[in-house]
Every structure is written in structure tokens, then in C-alpha cells.
Amino acid sequence: MELQKLHYSVAEGIATITMDYGKNLNAIDDQMADELIFCIGEAEKDPEVKVILLNSAAKAFSAGGDIGFFYKLVKAGGEINMDSLIGKVGKITNGMKSSKKMIVAAVNGAAVGAGFPLALSADFIIADEKAMFILAFVNLGLVPDTGAAYLLCKSIGEKRTMKYAATGKPIKADEALALGLVEKVVPPEELAAESLKLAKKFVAGPLVSYTNIKKQIYAASFSDYERFLDDVENPTQHECSNTEDFKEGCAAFMEKRKAAFQGK
């Protein structure tokens, strides 16, 4: 597959996947999703790869969904169907959680919308001091998708997840550390070195043990993840994406103003 928005390399047992769609701050569209699925799959089946490192070459980790694309769908009229893209990103997060290999995410700047669960699907997150995690879906009149509600509930519980999902309140780096979402917070200039250091630690560790630890934790905590994505998340997001509030949320975002929701 010819990569347009990612870079993929393997060295010293580490597969590095670098998102590099800087113009749109690594917004996740169909092309980006397809490339992530491909690269994670390549790393998973490569016996030379012991650890996966996910990072960004842009000024943010990921801006989430491409709202400009959504706005074009809104303006075109008719039923809006984001099931395919949401399904692809759900496949990415589920693939990361069920991977046999340890995954480290280096989060710089904002991880917004779908970018949040993308980071959260890694086994360990190293964040820089400017990192910010935001469930921004509600600001568009949507619900969390790509596994965000599920993954965050598993990590910090129902009440805290409700707080961030219903308000869109950012979780800053120091708060993410206190909540146990990230392993370490470092200055921006140290992020690359610290995340690579952790990845190398796992390369030199008991790999069979790591694989089976992941298998146990996935079975204990995430065995119903696919059912949640298919039976709960996709239908609720489909309903929300065909409301007047979603149209208004997209328009407000593009016009850089506060949304005037009507509750319908």
C-alpha cells in the first residue's frame, strides 16, 4: 500500500507508525484510517517487530474526524452515513487492544475526538506537557465514537467519563497523569526520546509474557468491545449524525462561532 499520510519503519524490533497529515492536524479520514489499519496489520504479522510505537509529525497528535468533510455531507443534504469511517477506526482501536505486541503512543498536543481513543488504545502513553485529551463530540451534537466511551469508562469509570463526554471538557496532561491515563508527562523536546526509551525497554523484555498479559487483560476487560461498537455505538452515532443539531454543530465549527442547538 502506498502511504500518503503515514510513515512506517522498522528498526531494532520497533515498528514506528508516524501520522503526518500536518495540514489537517492528522484528522482521521478514510485514507488515514485505511493506512493505520494497514500499518498496524503489517506490524502485527512481522516477526521482526516486537513493539509498536505510534506518534505524530504534526503539531497535534490528532484532531479527530475531518469536520470539513462532515460539513460537506451536511450541505449536500440527504441521509448522513458515517458508519464506514467509524467502523474503520473502531477496527483500528480494537486491533490495537487485541494486538499481541506492546504498543506505546507518544502524544504531542491535542488528541481530539477519535484521536483520543486512538491514543487510549495504546498500552502505554507518554505525553508531552502540552498534551490535551478532548471528547469533543458533544460540541457537534454527536456522541463519542470509535470506542471512546467504552475505553474511557474502562479506564476512569462511569462518572468521570460522563463528565468529559457530556461537557467536552479537556483533560490536560497533568490531569491525565493523575487519572492514570498516561504513564509519564515530559517536556515536548523529550517526548521522542522518552517514548523510544520505553519501547526499547519492552523490546528487551519477556515478549511471550507481554503477549499473554495483554491476552488476559483483553479477555477480562474488553471481550465485549466489538459488540459495543456494533450494537450500541454505531446506531447511536448514526441517529445523532442525522439531526438538525449536528448540522448546526458542523456549521458553527466551520464558522468559528458557538453552536445554537435546538434539541432536534
PLM ranges: what are they?
Residues 64, 83-86, 90, 113, ...:
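Glycine-rich phosphate-binding loop at the start of an alpha helix
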Residues 56-94, 111, 224:
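Glycine- (often His-adjacent) and acidic-residue-rich active-site loop
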Residues 91-100, 106, 112-166, 179, ...:
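CoA-thioester-processing core
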Residues 1-3, 251-264:
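Terminal low-complexity tails and localization/encapsulation signals of metabolic enzymes
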Residues 1-57, 94:
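Conserved CoA-thioester-binding segment of acyl-CoA-metabolizing enzymes
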Residues 124, 163, 167-169, 175, ...:
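Well-ordered beta-strand positions
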Residues 22, 126-131, 182-231, 244, ...:
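C-terminal long alpha-helix characteristic of the crotonase
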